[in-house]
Amino acid sequence: KKNGDEIIFTRDTHGEDYLDTPEGRKLPVKHCIRGTDGWQIADGLMVSGAVCIDKPTFGSNRLAGILMTERAQEALEIELVGLCTDICVVSNALLFKAAMPEAPITVDASCCAGVTPESHRHALETMKMCQIKVVND
């Protein structure tokens, strides 16, 4: 933020019926239920002027659309960090790369974590193979 960069959070957001959804049936762990402490952006991360976009699944089509339309006139560079490398981060990175193939996309591996160390490494390798720059690996 102090460099003048825009900060946008995506927040996994589910309802009380999560376990009855297609995702919930395949990943039967209630998490990020709207309004709970686990749903909120962690203390110390939210900064003034940051945007928070709720997303019902792994990748954010809404954010991709915003970046493609509202930011289309800007020289766009995207840096991703977050949890989980092997679910949400990789999904957003690939979604953004497909939507904006010329935009430089970077993932800071030191600011990410996967479900397991192995799945974290696999996700980083997948992103590298798709021409997404991975730093601090």
Task: Please give the residue ranges for each predicted region.
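Active-site-adjacent betaalpha module
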Residues: 2-6, 15, 21-137
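Active-site loop/turn elements of alpha/beta-hydrolase fold enzymes
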Residues: 12
